[in-house]
From Swiss-Prot:
A single GO BP: translation
Protein name according to UniProt: Aspartyl/glutamyl-tRNA(Asn/Gln) amidotransferase subunit B
Role this protein plays: Allows the formation of correctly charged Asn-tRNA(Asn) or Gln-tRNA(Gln) through the transamidation of misacylated Asp-tRNA(Asn) or Glu-tRNA(Gln) in organisms which lack either or both of asparaginyl-tRNA or glutaminyl-tRNA synthetases. The reaction takes place in the presence of glutamine and ATP through an activated phospho-Asp-tRNA(Asn) or phospho-Glu-tRNA(Gln).
Family: Belongs to the GatB/GatE family. GatB subfamily.
Lineage top rank: taxon: Bacteria
Organism, as annotated: Synechococcus sp. (strain WH7803)
Alphabetic keyword roster: ATP-binding, Ligase, Nucleotide-binding, Protein biosynthesis
Catalyses which reaction(s): L-glutamyl-tRNA(Gln) + L-glutamine + ATP + H2O = L-glutaminyl-tRNA(Gln) + L-glutamate + ADP + phosphate + H(+); L-aspartyl-tRNA(Asn) + L-glutamine + ATP + H2O = L-asparaginyl-tRNA(Asn) + L-glutamate + ADP + phosphate + 2 H(+)
PROSITE patterns for this protein: GATB
Gene this chain is encoded by: gatB
Subunit structure: Heterotrimer of A, B and C subunits.
GO molecular function terms noted in the UniProt entry: asparaginyl-tRNA synthase (glutamine-hydrolyzing) activity; ATP binding; glutaminyl-tRNA synthase (glutamine-hydrolyzing) activity
InterPro entries: Asn/Gln-tRNA_amidoTrfase_suB/E, Asn/Gln-tRNA_Trfase_suB/E_cat, Asn/Gln_amidotransferase, Asn/Gln_tRNA_amidoTrase-B-like, GatB, GatB_C_1, GatB_Yqey_C_2, Gln-tRNA_amidoTrfase_suB_CS
SUPFAM superfamilies linked: GatB/YqeY motif (SSF89095), Glutamine synthetase/guanido kinase (SSF55931)
Length: 494
């Protein structure tokens, strides 16, 4: 395609994502073969997976349930009737030489999600991204190339059909994304939603979630779309962002140099941080779709839809809004707490047990999250139970212990659990909040540091911090800091 006509308009990227989500069923989409990951090659295959003559596929009903729930969470319209089609292409990882997918009658269409975008150097903003469709299909096998990471240049290739026939939900966004960051945040939100639903683990390293990016550039928002390029081989959200950013600049430079953009599929090379040409891009006509004669129409009744909708959990975006609007949390804390459902569940249990939401959020997103992540633990199995953290937060909030004391006992609580109050009482760690006791210690300190007292009264008021530090040292951090500051201020001023 020729370069767009030069105008005063800045270049704008137009990005859409095709997200392939492996549905977390125990058996494959059309057969009882296992979906277990990481086992020896070609151990989870059977005549249906291999496409042997005389075999017939049977739709796994759990796949249909998961696909419909995913579609509902993405605000898609569920089709009462849909069908499966055969997508014809010849490649070693496809044992039947066709893939069972959905072409013109998918299970769901026309939805949207809200994405929170944190662009570097800019304010966080919300953006609604349209979703074209969600359809079910089977995954292909996996090729391992010897001597190269690609077919070209390899000495030979091995094929593992364990993945062939695993259920996929393909989610196709509308071309509403404009930056690499938006694309990465959109993909991240899709994974977050799938994990909340429990329909997929979304593990990108294991291929449970894979994204293909379609990207073009144009002169301004009113200009027609440019030539679309597909990018594959991105195994992280940061790779999605970097691949988009690189490709946007590559296309702009090509147009400005008068070079055409070719409709093609390109691979993201993580080591070189660039995209490189893989093959020309096929169109729908190249696949010669036709209805699969071995599979009947798919029907989803109103009762089924109502039943499955009732089982949906509160989703991440709704949680973020509730945490900010009802609990008064910052956007940042709401985002961090809702990133993983187990963390959100833990936080909510702490609040239900009586803790102040903001204080609980500070502890969970800080010290507790660091401990869980560094030790690769789950919140469900953390020895420090939500009600115990709530007890500790209440001790701090009620002035019974200081934050310093809480930090001192926290490692033991994280490792073994137990009652924070019992530990505080047993070790005499409670806050000193008796004014007379604190006043006596202050008098002692002022008497021991006459030069500093004179300097303070001479205008060096920052020395109050020195006395606070000495007081905390003397009391082992147990003095009520607010009361201590009040008494110190009064005494220092004479």
């Amino acid at each position: 395609m020729a370069a767009p006509a030069a105008t005063d308009q800045a270049w704008e990227a137009v990005i859409g994502l095709e997200t392939h989500v492996q549905l977390g069923t125990n058996s494959k989409i059309f057969t009882a073969a296992s979906t277990a990951f990481g086992d020896d090659p070609n151990t989870h295959i059977d005549p249906v997976v291999c496409g042997l003559p005389g075999t017939l596929p049977v739709l796994n009903q759990k796949v249909l349930e998961y696909a419909v729930k995913a579609a509902m969470a993405l605000n898609l319209n569920i089709a009462e009737h849909s069908k499966f089609d055969r997508k014809q292409y010849f490649y070693p990882d496809l044992p039947k030489n066709y893939q069972i997918s959905q072409y013109d009658e998918p299970i769901a269409e026309d939805g949207w999600i809200e994405v929170e975008v944190a662009e570097k150097g800019k304010d966080t903003y919300l953006k609604t991204i349209g979703i074209e469709r969600l359809h079910m299909e089977e995954d292909a096998g996996k090729l391992v190339h010897a001597g190269s990471d690609r077919l070209a240049g390899s000495t030979h290739s091995l094929v593992d059909y364990n993945r062939a026939g695993v259920a996929l939900a393909e989610i196709v966004s509308k071309p509403d994304l404009r930056t690499g960051r938006e694309a990465a945040e959109y993909a991240s939100e899709i994974r977050r939603i799938m994990r909340y639903l429990g329909v997929s683990d979304g593990n990108m390293q294991e291929g449970s979630l894979r994204c293909d990016v379609n990207i073009s550039v144009r002169r301004g928002p009113e200009a027609p779309f440019g030539t679309k390029v597909e990018i594959k081989n991105m195994n992280s959200f940061s790779a999605i962002q970097k691949a988009c950013e690189y490709e946007i600049q590559r296309q702009i430079k090509a147009y400005e140099a008068g070079e055409p953009i070719v409709q093609e599929t390109r691979l993201w090379d993580e080591s070189k941080q660039l995209t490189k040409s893989m093959r020309s891009k096929e169109g729908a006509s190249d696949y010669r779709y036709f209805p699969d004669p071995d599979l009947g129409p798919i029907e989803v009744s109103a009762d089924q839809r109502d039943s499955w909708r009732a089982e949906l959990p509160e989703l991440p975006a709704a949680k973020r809004h509730r945490y900010a609007d009802t609990l008064g949390l910052s956007q940042y804390d709401a985002r961090v707490l809702t990133d993983e459902k187990p963390m959100a569940d833990y936080f909510e249990a702490v609040v239900v047990a009586g803790a102040d939401a903001k204080l609980a959020a500070n502890w969970i997103t800080g010290d507790i999250a660091a401990y869980v992540n560094s030790n690769r633990l789950s919140y469900a199995n953390l020895p420090f139970r939500p009600e115990q953290l709530a007890e500790m937060v209440q001790l701090i909030d009620g002035g019974k212990i200081s934050g310093k004391i809480a930090k001192e006992i926290l490692p033991e609580l994280l490792e073994n659990g137990g009652s924070p109050k019992a530990i505080v009482d047993e070790r005499g760690l409670g806050m000193i909040s008796d004014p007379a006791a604190i006043e006596a210690i202050v008098d002692e300190l002022l008497g021991a540091h006459p030069d500093e007292v004179e300097a303070f009264r001479g205008g060096k008021t920052k020395l109050q911090g020195f006395f606070v530090g000495q007081l905390m040292k003397k009391t082992g951090g147990k003095a009520d800091p607010k009361l201590a500051n009040q008494i110190l201020s009064k005494k220092l001023k004479g």
